[in-house]
């Protein structure tokens, strides 16, 4: 009897082709469309269009489609932490948390309730199982590789997951969809954070976090202007500072270099590679190891953003924290970002950046930049929710 595989059908071309390939491999395939966010009146969230597209794919492939809402779980496990991190001066990545908590957390459990032996998605990554060991490997299409977003998914969950697109390039995926007559073959890829869509990020965040004005200063303490809240700015930011044209300074862009949480001050500098923007060392906590290091030091690569290249580095490892020394400085690294570690194509795991030392700071500065785990803020509006739905 063929194995039942539950495919997360998002409404996009990637998940549609994942389902197609599994059908061609002889599996019993069921589609599962999950909703994590409510459609808003302005139409920024594409939930309704995504569901309609998932319906059309399921009909074309002749597979059942189930629908479920994880809005409550997303609200509590992802979005509330996202807001708390920004309120605490961090720069989080909710997509990493969503993969750990929702897509390969509660959704994987739901797939098992549907009788699925595995959960498959349209992620560009590879899972290799050999010798009793599971390895998470980069996709063949390096430009589309999504291992960075999967770094926090536990090995036990990944062992029950299939990534059918791991050996394919994006162009090949679209061509497969076109030849199979899938109605989403030319549907544009989704971009940005899922619950924000194409709306201005500042306006979205301002709907939940109240302004908290403070000074914009140079590293020497000269006041240049006012910001409306540290939460609305991130390290390396250039736009929206409104501090240009200052007498005594060159006509050059200003960049956010640091946040002084104690004084609610935003520190800005001139120069794209100003020393205060270049991280020479940083600390990572909230670790998830997919391949546990054998010793207390490790030479590997580190990736701190999606689609950024690996930077060779040395790790000094203890039970709860990793100190990272990159072989070359990393620009605009913010507390709250995720760092993923790689040995060649294999993702070893990763964690959250909790402290940063730059080329212009003394060694003890890394302690000063370390932030406590964020507390959830008081919200200006309630968080979205949606009731669960069943099979369609």
Task: Tell me the role of every PLM-derived stretch.
Residues 1-152, 162, 171-172, 178, ...:
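ATP-dependent adenylation/nucleotidyltransferase module used to activate substrates
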Residues 13, 120-127, 132-385, 391-392:
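AMP-forming adenylation/ATP pyrophosphatase catalytic core
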């Amino acid at each position: 009897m063929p194995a039942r595989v539950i495919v997360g059908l998002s409404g996009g071309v990637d998940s549609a082709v994942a389902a197609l390939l599994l059908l061609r491999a002889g599996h019993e395939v069921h589609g599962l469309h999950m909703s994590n966010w409510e459609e808003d009146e302005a139409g920024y969230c594409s939930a309704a269009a995504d569901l309609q597209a998932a319906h059309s794919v399921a009909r074309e492939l002749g597979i059942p489609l189930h629908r479920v809402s994880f809005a409550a779980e997303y609200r509590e496990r992802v979005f509330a932490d996202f807001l708390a991190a920004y309120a605490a001066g961090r720069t989080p990545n909710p997509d990493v948390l969503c993969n750990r908590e929702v897509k390969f957390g509660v959704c994987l459990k739901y797939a098992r309730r549907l009788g699925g032996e595995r959960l498959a998605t349209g992620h560009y990554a590879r899972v290799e199982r050999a010798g009793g060991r599971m390895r998470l490997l980069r996709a063949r299409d390096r430009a589309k590789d999504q291992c960075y977003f999967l770094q926090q998914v536990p090995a036990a969950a990944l062992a029950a997951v299939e990534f059918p697109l791991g050996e394919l390039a994006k162009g090949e995926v679209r061509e497969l969809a076109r030849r199979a007559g899938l109605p989403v073959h030319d549907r544009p890829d989704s971009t940005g954070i899922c619950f924000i869509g194409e709306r201005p990020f500042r306006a979205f965040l301002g709907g939940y976090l109240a302004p908290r004005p403070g000074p914009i200063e140079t590293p020497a303490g000269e006041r240049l202007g006012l910001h409306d809240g540290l939460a609305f700015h991130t390290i390396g930011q250039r736009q929206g500072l409104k501090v240009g044209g200052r007498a005594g300074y060159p006509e050059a862009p200003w960049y956010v270099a640091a946040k002084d949480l104690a004084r609610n001050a935003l520190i800005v500098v001139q120069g794209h590679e100003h020393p205060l923007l270049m991280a020479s060392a940083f600390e990572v906590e909230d670790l998830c190891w997919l391949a546990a290091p054998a010793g207390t030091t490790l030479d590997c690569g580190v990736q701190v953003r999606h689609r950024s290249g690996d930077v060779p580095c040395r790790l000094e490892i203890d039970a709860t924290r990793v100190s990272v020394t990159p072989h070359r400085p990393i620009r605009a690294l913010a507390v709250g970002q995720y760092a993923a570690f790689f040995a060649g194509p294999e993702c070893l795991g990763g964690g959250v950046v909790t402290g940063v030392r730059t080329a212009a700071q003394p060694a003890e500065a890394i302690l000063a930049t370390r932030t406590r785990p964020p507390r959830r803020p008081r919200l200006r509006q309630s968080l979205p929710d949606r009731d669960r739905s069943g099979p369609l």
